[in-house]
Amino acid sequence: MKPDIHPNYRVVVFHDTSANAYFTIGSTIRTERTITLNGEEYPYVTVDVSSESHPFYTGKQKTLSQEGSTARFQKKFGRFIGNK
């Protein structure tokens, strides 16, 4: 294995700013910012969306359409296909 070609893997704190949640995860991301969490200093990265705030994971997602593609097609073009 060649030396100095692999990124530095370390523990990083990700901060979900929309949910104000902190995640301590191993990562190779580069950042100059640091934060002290639980008495230790870690590299710090902010994120807009995480599993704490994404609607899919929180269960607050909206369903846009319940009908299938066939029903939408019939509604749109059914009058043209109707009687032969």
From Swiss-Prot:
Coiled-coil annotated spans: none
SUPFAM superfamilies associated with the record: L28p-like
Any one GO cellular component localisation term in the record: ribonucleoprotein complex
Record keywords, A-Z: Ribonucleoprotein, Ribosomal protein
Keyword hit for Ribonucleoprotein: yes
UniProt cross-references to Pfam families, sorted A to Z: Ribosomal_L31
GO biological process: translation
Molecular function via GO: structural constituent of ribosome
Keyword ATP-binding: no
Source species, domain of life: Bacteria
Subunit structure: Part of the 50S ribosomal subunit.
Entry's family note: Belongs to the bacterial ribosomal protein bL31 family. Type B subfamily.
HAMAP family: Ribosomal_bL31_2
PANTHER family: 50S RIBOSOMAL PROTEIN L31, CHLOROPLASTIC, LARGE RIBOSOMAL SUBUNIT PROTEIN BL31C
Protein name: Large ribosomal subunit protein bL31B
